[in-house]
């Protein structure tokens, strides 16, 4: 039986180091409203959508990095308005963020949120690109391996908005095995937010 689901790919644009969570959440809420006005039922936001793409910078004070860029709970008081907006509009979304677990583990994470504003599923990025060592002479750095651990939740699917949906994040898209594992579980949609530089590392 044919099914129709209108999905919006939300282009957030740059977030700067000085931008607060409130700034990011306000922009995300507006994108939700815009997508809803066009009939979308599901919005895919980018990787690490709540902050600037901080793995570009070498920072030595991990305590400061944790406080500034990582989410200890989801939703938090700062991000709850996004979930409330989704519930108000009856629209689901995928969003990426930096997760700090109660045990002190750090992951590049994405979640599926239902149209009732509740979290349906979570995925932690497995294929981390870049490097962990400092390269001060490089044109730019890509330090995901410094700031994140390899994801530990595997490749899963969820029943979501009448479909079977899986999640990946950015660099995961370069490995066909990830899609194959999801397809073998019946995935009909793979939500995949990314945050990619205009120039690649050489």
Q: What role is predicted for each listed range?
A:
Residues 1, 87-88, 159-161:
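Extracellular/periplasmic catalytic domains that process cell-envelope and extracellular macromolecules
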Residues 1-15:
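Short beta-strand segments enriched in small/hydrophobic residues
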Residues 5, 39-41, 89-92, 163, ...:
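Loop/turn elements at helix/coil->beta-strand transitions in domains of secreted/extracellular proteins
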Residues 13-22, 60, 71, 133-137, ...:
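Acidic/histidine-rich helix-loop elements
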Residues 21-116, 122-124, 130-131, 196-202:
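Cys-nucleophile CN-hydrolase/nitrilase-fold catalytic domain and related Cys-dependent amidase chemistry
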Residues 101-189, 193-202:
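Active-site catalytic loop in hydrolytic enzyme cores
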């Amino acid at each position: 039986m044919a099914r129709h689901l209108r999905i919006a790919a939300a282009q957030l644009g740059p977030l700067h180091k000085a931008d607060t969570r409130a700034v990011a959440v306000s922009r995300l809420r507006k994108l939700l409203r815009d997508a809803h006005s066009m009939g979308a039922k599901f919005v895919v936001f980018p990787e690490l959508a709540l902050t600037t793409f901080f793995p570009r910078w070498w920072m030595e004070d991990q305590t400061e990095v944790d406080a500034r860029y990582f989410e200890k709970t989801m939703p938090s008081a700062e991000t709850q308005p996004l979930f409330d907006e989704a519930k108000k509009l009856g629209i689901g979304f995928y969003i990426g963020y930096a997760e700090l677990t109660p045990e002190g583990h750090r992951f590049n994470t994405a979640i599926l949120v239902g149209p009732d504003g509740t979290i349906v599923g979570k995925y932690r990025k497995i294929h981390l690109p870049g490097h962990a060592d400092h390269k001060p002479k490089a044109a730019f750095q890509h330090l995901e391996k410094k700031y994140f651990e390899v994801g530990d939740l595997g490749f899963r699917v969820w029943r979501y908005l009448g479909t079977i949906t899986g999640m990946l994040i950015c660099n995961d898209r370069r490995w066909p095995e990830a899609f194959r594992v999801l397809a073998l579980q019946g995935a009909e949609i793979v939500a995949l937010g990314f945050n990619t530089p205009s120039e690649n590392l050489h």
